[in-house]
């Protein structure tokens, strides 16, 4: 304090530096992706645990807050944010220990969250027919989104029916049904509507003799997914997106083939965990052929599966569209075996002189579309110069991006060789999504869409 007071008295006209500092070590945005994924997952999970633990404590149903579990989990997350761990520049054995520590943090965080959700669910009036299912919203605005829930029954079931609080039947998609040790479990998918801010909505689950027949605006074929908002068309030979059409505005959002996975030579001059050496695109996955299969069509979700090969690696994408949701989801599984290559998903956007915006901690920033590898959090956005429309790219676990003119790309995986020669070799899962919107990113609420993609609605089967 004394130092600051003395400086203030000097009244020197200090120079002001406005804007970001130079980007350093862009390879760190994508190296060791499983560590980065665990970091994102734990950050989201702990925020949910804190919110619902506080609500459970304030409800008066208990005088206990799981501070030890939450504190110890945060300590692990923060320790792993040390610059040689989270940035991906440690040696291989470090990440074996880090994986174990994240598992411990997740166990503690989930224990705190689940205990709090059960406490709150048991306070809710749930008398009535069937089994109560409570859907919780961890974000501070009302949401209508898909929910996946695991339901347990003590008697045999052949199908499931879900009713809302008014008794109206809600379209439900049965994903899996199995019997084990005298209990029957059903994995279901349904659209929860108007779940209140930091609140809940109650549904009732009943066994059914057969799967329900519901009206749905969701249609699908071997190359087209369509709902009331979006029509997505794929090339059945390559798996590339040929059209992303906004039905509400009549706008085509792709200027050329989209969701093209580009394998790029990545040959930095040393320090490959830290640095990139991006050169030419050596292959566009799918240009040598791809498998495109129509694997799922229900009243809630339809899915096309795209399988593509690159050298010794395999990429499997489930491209999903939900009834009532203006967003296309991509769930990606990959077996990565390459070195000195980076793979990005590219989206050329049909917008006039677009402005590139990137989410940063506690805000968003505009950057020039020069093609440099830059960091961002849960979303980036391209909106046209007039602010009439835009396209947001959401993600659940990636931090490296680039925008060149009207093409935005997300960095999915790379093959660094130093200090860990086996960095990122093996199996990975991730998710990203495209969200077309009217207006710019603020008017389109892209910041909310990024949070929703990372913190889906939570379902808890309550005690009767």
Language model features with spans:
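Hydrophobic, mid-to-C-terminal alpha-helical segments
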Residues: 1-7
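C-terminal (or distal) subdomains of carbohydrate-active enzymes
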Residues: 10-12, 17, 107, 114, ...
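Metal- or metallocofactor-binding catalytic centers and their adjacent structured scaffolds
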Residues: 7-123, 128-129
